[in-house]
Regions:
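Soluble catalytic domains of enzymes that build or remodel membrane lipids, polysaccharides, and related
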Residues: 1-227
Length: 227
């Protein structure tokens, strides 16, 4: 029911574009109660230009015990291909270190997770590699699960950087600690000419609870003007 409510609230925004900034899965594909039902719900998300996603650090195959994961070895490319298939069936375009030009108007680039990029990616593209072949007169939007490399992305000409990962700390006092870990732990930050937005996310990690933080769908109104 929570997923249905999320879809209803997203559609109520009448969005032009929907992006999911990673951590779509909770590590184990087998943890999904009813994958076909989930596909049906996600297919209900409506937007003018479609639904796009990148993967996060939890979109990796790991065992779960009491809400926490174990067994991942650094460097493993343990992405379950069924995750890719589910997104495709749900009509969600997964961007794995690649970008698309939408409506011949703006770019959208999805970065793999920095530490856990998944199958077939030994290292992710550097910020300057992302933008080098793009028309800098067009807006460049990036989906990056973790809000890192903000300065480098700004210098590379990225206009908007959309992130998740932090959960805004999820539970007190974690939300206070986030300020020491991330330049922008949650919300909005202007970095040079780039706009960075970090959402607390609609979901959870570990215990199924929040204390002192809120889950959210993050509507963003973007209006670009010619220079």
């Amino acid at each position: 029911r929570q997923m249905e409510q999320m879809t209803e609230k997203v559609n109520a925004q009448n969005p032009d574009l929907v992006v999911i900034a990673g951590d779509i899965f909770d590590n184990e594909y087998e943890a999904l109660d009813d994958p076909e039902r989930l596909i049906s719900i996600l297919k209900g998300i409506k937007s003018k230009y479609g639904v796009f996603a990148c993967y996060g650090n939890h979109d990796i195959q790991e065992k779960i015990l009491a809400g926490f994961t174990f067994g991942y070895r650094e460097g493993e490319k343990a992405r379950d291909p069924r995750m890719d298939e589910l997104l495709e069936k749900a009509g969600i375009t997964l961007l794995r270190d690649e970008g698309v030009l939408i409506d011949n108007s703006f770019y959208l680039y999805g970065r793999p997770d920095e530490k856990r990029p998944g199958r077939g990616i030994t290292r992710r593209a550097k910020p300057e590699e992302i933008t080098k072949d793009m028309d800098q007169d067009k807006p460049i939007l990036v989906i990056d699960h973790e809000p890192s490399q903000l300065g480098e992305l700004s210098e590379a000409g990225v206009d908007v950087d959309l992130c998740g990962h932090t959960h805004d700390g999820q539970m007190f006092p974690g939300n206070l600690v986030m300020d020491f870990l991330w330049e922008n732990p949650c919300g909005y930050l202007k970095k040079g000419d780039m706009h960075n937005i970090v959402t607390s996310g609609v979901g959870l990690f570990g215990p199924n609870m929040r204390v002192g933080t809120k889950a959210e769908i993050c509507p963003i109104k973007i209006q670009f003007e010619a220079a």
